[in-house]
């Protein structure tokens, strides 16, 4: 038994998990929000629905999104017209696209992260990958590992159909992997392409219209590991703690169903209030052990589900406007990219901190929180410690 205890100690890292590199990627097709209603109603052959188009234009303006990147183009939609219907059975057409394109876009983000990390791909020991779409066997994790040329010994984990909170949740998983496997280097990748949720407009389906107005495509990747090699690996953040909380009796707040016509989503109008009203408890649980009880004393890397959610959090927790400014900026420039979004926010924060001459990667502060919100209702809270700049 003594030998077993010694072996277990030897298997563990000495220090905390750190985020060593960040990479992001989007499809090349940029859509300005101001002209998106014209594009959307044209490609879905819905220009006869002028009143609905006016309503959709107001919805697009209200999102506060300025532009988004999408895989779908007018050419692709002409080749696959079923995608433009409201609820015509079209799963096979959609699946044919995402099975190929999700790993490809993920590869772009992963390669950027690996390049910043500065070590050979052969030294990646674990791959954790999530996407709401593209369920297949072998999965997108296998396809990505093959595209990247990762070693056959890499330990893969694929997570499907989990949505917006999963970017934060994967950091919780990566922390445990890195700290319990000495020398582990975990490539964490989130990639979301909205092909399975794109569809034509319908007067009675507000949720579907809201999705067309706010969702974007993107991929984010990070490399996580403990005990960084001096002079080679340069941590950006330490992962001090990570935890999940499910809000009681909230399964109807937000979610989705996979059908023959793709993904259909639902959400309550009260969703921003539900998140804001319950977030304080999660923050208390995460930050109290550090002696932090003032939410303005930490930096924020929050998933911006929509503008109303950001507003509700800011008001309920009495945050100064700068705390969620990075989340607002990313949402404005990219829309809601579901699980990948939080990696864009984290990347933007560390870059902004450097450009503005802050003393740390966390806007000059030592401690911060990375937050994800998703179906469940699930609240993911990751405590980050910034690094000096």
Swiss-Prot record:
EC assignment: the record states 2.3.1.217
Q: What is the effect of changing residue 303 to A/Q?
A: Strong reduction in enzyme activity
What the record says about temperature is: Optimum temperature is 50 degrees Celsius.
Q: How does activity depend on pH?
A: Optimum pH is 9.0.
Q: Which ranges form a coiled coil?
A: none
Tissue spec. comment: Expressed in both the leaf and rhizome, with higher expression in the rhizome.
| InterPro entries xrefs | Chalcone/stilbene_synt_C, Chalcone/stilbene_synt_N, Polyketide_synthase_type-III, Thiolase-like
Pathway membership = Secondary metabolite biosynthesis; flavonoid biosynthesis
> Catalytic residues?
164
Q: Which Gene3D superfamilies match?
A: 3.40.47.10
Keywords attached to this Swiss-Prot or TrEMBL record, sorted alphabetically, are: Acyltransferase, Flavonoid biosynthesis, Transferase
Q: Name one GO biological process term.
A: flavonoid biosynthetic process
Q: Name one GO molecular function term.
A: acyltransferase activity, transferring groups other than amino-acyl groups
Superkingdom is Eukaryota
Q: Subunit notes for this chain?
A: Homodimer.
Stated role: Catalyzes the synthesis of curcumin by condensing feruloyl-CoA with a diketide-CoA in the curcuminoid biosynthesis.
Family per record: Belongs to the thiolase-like superfamily. Chalcone/stilbene synthases family.
What is the name attached to this protein's record? Answer: Curcumin synthase 1
Q: Which organism is it from?
A: Curcuma longa
> Gene encoding it?
CURS1
